Amino acid sequence: MLIRWKSKDKSSSSTSSSSSTSKKKRKGRESEDDWQNDKSNRNQPTDQAIDDRRRSARSREDPRRHTLGGDMLQWHKECPHALTIARLSYFHSPFCLYPLLPQQTPQMRVYTPTNQGPLFDDDPGIMSEAETASTGFRRGGKQRSSLPVVRTPSKTLERPLGLVFLQYRSETKRALLPNEITSIDTVRALFVRSFPRQLTMQYLEGPNVKIYIHDSSKDMFYELEDVRSHLREIRDRSVLRLFESNEVSAPQVLPGGQNIPQPLQPAAIPNQWDQEQSYFSEPEFDSEYQHQHIHKSKQPTKTPYYVGTTQTLPRGMYSDRTKGAIDGYMSSPERSGASRGAYEEPYYSQYGTRSATVTPIIDEEQGDISIADDQYAMYGVKNVGRIPRVPPNQMYDHTRSEDLHRIRVEHMERQLANLTGLVQKALTQNPQLPLVNNSPNILNIPGQYRNAEATGDGTVCTREKPPKLGKSTCHKSVSFEKSVSFSDDIQGVPKSHSPQHSADTKPPKPAIKSSTLPRTSSQERDRLKPPPPPKPLVMIAGNQYRTDLTLAPEVYNQLRGLQKKAMDLRTEVRTLRRLTQTQAVAVREDIKDTFMRIRATLLSNSGFVWGQGDKERTNLTREEEIYKQEVIRLEKDLADLESSVEGLRGEVINRRTRVNMVAVEDMALVLSRASKTVAELKMRFPVLQQGLRNLISNEMEHVCREEAFLKDEPDRLENALRRCKKLTGTLVTLKRLASVQEQRLPIPDTAGTDETIKPPETHNNVNKPIPSPRLGTVVASGGIAPENALDALLDXXXXXXXXAALHHADAHRPDDSTSDDSSQTLQNSITTKISQSQLYPSEPVSSNVGLRRLHSYPSGSDTDTSPPQPTRPTTGKPPVPERNAELLSKVNNKRVPPPPPPRTSSRSPLASPTSPHVPQHHRGQQQQQPAVTLSDCEQQQRTSEGTDSGSESVCSDNSQRQLALELRHQELLKKQRQLQEQYQRLQQMSKNAVPLAPTTMNHDIKKTGSESNLPLKMGYNMTVSGSMKNLCGGSGDPTLPFDPSQGSVANNVDHQDGGGSDSSTGGPNSLDGVAIGANGSVGTLPPHLTKTTNKVYETDIL
């Protein structure tokens, strides 16, 4: 803006001039009120400010046409005295600089208007605030809209009012043109007034904001300079466009226009040293006073230049200005190259300041020198020629670190996009020799410094250079990315607009072809997004120059590698984005499905989880609350009514006052309403009472059930525990009994009785669980596995005692000629838990087999004096298969056949007293008891087969088993007769009661397993077989009665000899010797039967 400095004596001019000034000021105030109508978000001037303005109008001779100030009202309310201090301290500020001085001199206190050229005489009516500060003029901190005072203008500037179209980003608004536009600040004020929530004057004064005007004749956009020739071009229906070269610093939407956010770019902010001093804005130091408007920036002492938190000074803002003024003409007060400050950030080096040269044609490239510098600065490479200047007291502001970090990230993304386009462009070119262009306007740019605009045919499109108007190293032209457009066309190469002026004269206006500008926003917004890379330029037919680059193979390969990396990165980013979207959709679907499942579960289980009683309880609670609230309201109304009635009654009685009918009617109305409420509540109470009673009864039942549960549950658990113990004892007893019965007693089978071979019906019950097969079976080579867990536990307890008893029994075993046959037969059959070889370790086949279960096998000897028993042939008998669950399942539904032949002991496989050499004189008397007893024993044995059949495996097929059963049936028919005779002999011997000699008993004992105490066990009423026929001679009472029909195990076990037993026996209740009664129950045999009976077993149960 043009500035006229006036001397002090001019202030005392004629009063007519002063009166005309007053008139003009009044007109200006009326017009300004018109301009201020829609600016509700800006502060209004105070009375003090208006008074100051009037005094300032009287104190000047010439009308002051226009100056610019900031939003100062809010700050002026806080610090009204700071403005005077700021103005007085201006000349003491180190920022009062002169561009032509070689150094900054803070001692320069006096302003000498050197260098005042003829441009100062353009308009005699302009006065600066610096002049008013020197003359003691105070404006009182009035907030001004920067619009000119509407008054009678100069004849040269007179123009009619009109409209102007203002465009900012994607918005377009109309504004009323003022009578005159004296400076570009007026245009900025138009923008601020049209966009109050987006723009501020401080932001528009920044170095990154430009205003362009549209030239419809050339379809160009020229940059609007702060010169009269440019400002006169703003006519009716002109289009003005605001362009931001760095959109990240654009202020956001302002709430009410008061709380102005700080821009993100480095701002001109004084530090603590100069906050108390006023300083001029950036344009005052960057131009050469050809067209300068010095104005004070009325900012608060504690509020920075951009209202917000404290920030540092912009880089190099007050550095050496000699370089910026060497070449003469400066295009704009906002544009001067500046060295970087101490906290230099290379990412902002090309965005923080603007070039000191004019930008006649907005070019994509930035010039031959500045492009290289800026590109190096973009990648963090400091240029050697740029020496950082440290301002005197510049302080680092940590509050901007987060914003700086975000901007750095955005700029890095932009660099990636630029690099991608650069590589793509370089690779699409043909490596040819560069064209030698003699024209100085042809811009030949190294390929590695060019922006990414590759053409379709592989050529590089360059445009004219901007004229070199004294460009120095720290100057740069406006980049193409700072352009704006109204056109819908794709951005391409702008048409060349050659300047018609030389570098000596005034420079041409900056122009932008409107077809090359983006439609709604600057290119900066698009460049902030890394993907996709910049689009290649579209080839346009005219005004293009072709130049080619010669690339070395290494550079070409590097560019190819960079292109590949960029493509990979782009693909990866695209893949990651797709994966993220897919995962987001999947997560949303999962959350939705989970919610639906939870909801369905709650709805389905609402009757069980919450229960119907809960709904009833909720309803009752709500009704009870409503009832209580109504009762409280009723009581309050009644209390108020009673107090009112009592007060009225007292006044009537005591003061003899008249009764007001209206008051009585009101009280009657309240009483009527209360009576109706009482009646309604009385009707509702029984229902509520019944519901609450039902609820209480239900809760009481629930409580009683819970108490009964808490009381009875311990007893129930104890009872269950006792039952478990009882069942455990019973099962142990039955297991031992099954171990005894599974020895397959040879039971004679009478042809007339079917029950001797028919199994009990109870064992064919379908509810009986089929036992699992035994865990181990005997093999011919050795290794025996325990039958089940209980056997294994009991076996571990008596392993040592069993081995000692085995060796002790071997010493007393008599020679037997039939042991080989019986042992071989047993080994071939493999039907029990232990083989015959365990009992006779002299056999080489089974001598190494460990002793697990000790069994006694029947012996064929009667007494010591009996004649030798002939052996019966056993070679015709097939091996007996083991019984298991599979076999049991086959025979459960059919008649169980007789068991296989018994395993015999050392005397003879089937030797008995009924052999041909034994006298048969008692045979006719033994026809009842043994048949019944042993038939039941066979029945129990078959029962035992059903219960313990899971321990053996099948060793032969069904045909062999059928043959064995037939042979066994025949043998049993014969044995039945033999047993009858034997029983008669036993009866005769019991009558005689002949005791046996203990010496012969001990001599003929056959000890198997832990049978060392068998003479003591004879008090258990065992029926001994084999060579143990004399064991009972010295043991208990021989006349102990035996009742086969007792149905239970005799309780005199362990009482015949004081209860002496081996540790391997089952204790007092071990059933070492049992007999089966006629009714199938277990009973103990009398001891005198043990002297002659051959087929009774002694078994040591582990």
Curated annotation (Swiss-Prot):
InterPro entries given in the database record: AIP3-like_C, SRCIN1
Feature: compositional bias, Pro residues: 867-881
Compositional bias segments (type: Basic and acidic residues): 1-11, 50-65
Stretches that traverse the bilayer: none
Keyword list, A-Z: Coiled coil
UniProt feature, compositional bias: Low complexity: 12-21, 904-918
Name of the protein in its database record: Coiled-coil domain-containing protein AGAP005037
Polar residues bias (residue ranges): 832-849, 936-958
GO cellular component: cytoplasm
